[in-house]
Amino acid sequence: MRLLLHLSVLIGLLGAAPRPARAQQPLEVVILAASHYNGSLAATYQPIIKKLRAYQPDMVFGEYLTAADAQALPATNQYQQAHQRRVSYLRRRALTTDPLTSRAAAAANRQLRRQPQLVRPRIDLARYYTFANDRGNAEYQLYLLEEPLKKNLTAADQAYYTQAMGPVDSLRKVRLVRPLTEYHKIIFPLLTEMGQAQLYGMDCQRYDEPWNEAYGQAITQNNALKAAFLIDSSTAQADTYRRMVATRTAYFAYLNQSDDDVEVYRLLNSPAYEKIDEALNFFGGEALYGAPGFPTEAVQEMRRQWVLRNQGMCDNVVRQARQQGARRVLVAVGASHGQTMRLLLQKMPNVQVRTFNDLP
């Protein structure tokens, strides 16, 4: 599928922050189960943005870590290692001055609320957020500079931008500009249209290590099943492998029902998708537990770590929404998280959950 969005006009980022309120006021969460690959032309996804904008969320969350959670990760974590590569990249740029302090960044944001068309404060903020391990907001500022504000850059602005951040090709290589993501194509344009200056992170990576261990065990057993199948396809284990392969076939057959990107998003947010996605991600899922040769224990451990991660994501959403006094929020998340987060949020007190498909 292909998704793309481009805004020709920047709408001022003036949105007022929600005010703190009672901790247990009713909270509504809309989940957008999104594709991580979005490669179509700009106008294609305006209907999705229009639908989300009509909902008027007080806050928008993305599948990024908060700066505090990211900074707390061990140096061996993949997310932390990627951050260190981005910091090293910035330190090699021509601009060698220190990034903004948190106080100066707050002042830059206040200035941009008054004058959202300014360019240099955004360059400084993009650099600040990158150093601070707030990847989501670094990418948001870079989206604004590369898309709606690009025409505003003078030659001097462009020179400063290159000194601070490097050429856009290099920014793509370090994955700070990712033109095909749901953020660049849908969420950042949505925030821009709504005048909201911040994307809130909610990912949880505390369970990354045990997840990877369980996944590695499952992959090893899956590969052994495949090797045995190629030798003898008549065994009970071979039948298990065929059932595992069938889940992948069913997954792609479901998504290939339509070439229309808006329709694909509807498919991603449907109960039918939740069922086949669960099977794909867990090597066939619960239906294969106990089947000959199936990595039952490893997959069960994967599932346990997956639920823990998604519970952490839900906790992050609800905690921050309560802190900000928000009454309705949008959560954009990879489609595989949609069902698990929905079920977990439904168990949380005073939280109502809707999906993208539930919106008018």
Language model features: what each stretch is:
Residues 31-33, 252-360:
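A cross-kingdom marker for long, charged
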Residues 152, 157-292:
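Extended, H/D-rich, highly charged conserved domains that either
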Residues 59-65, 196-204, 331-332:
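A structural signal for short, well-ordered beta-strand segments and their strand-loop junctions
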Residues 24-130:
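Internal alpha/beta domain cores that form substrate/cofactor-binding pockets in large enzymes
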Residues 83-153, 233-282:
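Low-complexity, serine/threonine/proline-enriched polar segments
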Residues 41-43, 70-75, 210-214, 339-345:
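A short acidic (Asp/Glu
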Residues 35-39, 171-180, 301-305:
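Second-shell loop/turn segments in exported
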Residues 1-27:
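Bacterial Sec-dependent N-terminal signal peptides
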